[in-house]
């Protein structure tokens, strides 16, 4: 087997714990819908005036150069807000405690509190079509939940590297939600 093929196979099939990627929170299983509380975290954020799915937005490379230059381990997932384009990397636990990390013109640092989201697990390529299809299913599910109310804009969550073939990719669509107060008893 040639080296490029071996590397592709390793990136595709080696479990994440063997690749050393720390996961910021548990995945939503593919095909499932759930609510989950995401933990408070320290984030690295890159922005573009272009939409996330527009080519040439440069978001990944801005963040990659930042983590590479600051010796921050890659974590998963990567979150993407669509319009304007925003990509978010989570810091691993050790890097989140570092005091030497500073924002740059390309990458902002942010703290986010714990938050409740409705989440759907998705298999397939990271495309606008797959995002829209999953979001429609998530909104339909949320319409059956009178105990939950949307609290923000939906966003994409990507678990795999760009080198993983689309059929093997795992993503999620999240919609921030809040519990509605129970109706008073009559």
Predicted features by range, described:
Residues 2-186:
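A solvent-exposed interaction/effector surface
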């Amino acid at each position: 087997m040639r080296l490029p093929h071996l590397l592709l196979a390793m990136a595709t099939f080696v479990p994440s714990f063997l690749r050393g990627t720390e996961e910021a929170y548990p995945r939503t299983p593919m095909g499932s819908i759930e609510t989950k509380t995401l933990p408070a975290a320290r984030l690295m954020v890159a922005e573009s005036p272009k939409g996330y799915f527009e080519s040439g937005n440069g978001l990944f490379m801005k963040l990659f150069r930042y983590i590479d230059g600051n010796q921050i381990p890659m974590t998963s997932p990567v979150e993407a807000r669509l319009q304007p384009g925003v990509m978010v990397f989570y810091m691993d636990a050790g890097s989140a405690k570092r005091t030497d990390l500073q924002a740059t013109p390309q990458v902002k640092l942010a703290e986010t509190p714990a938050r409740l989201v409705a989440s759907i697990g998705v298999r397939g390529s990271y495309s606008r079509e797959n995002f829209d299809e999953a979001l429609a299913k998530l909104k339909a599910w949320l319409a059956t939940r009178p105990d939950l109310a949307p609290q923000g804009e939906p966003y994409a969550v990507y678990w795999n590297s760009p080198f993983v073939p689309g059929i093997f990719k795992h993503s999620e669509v999240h919609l921030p939600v809040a519990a509605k107060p129970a109706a008073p008893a009559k």
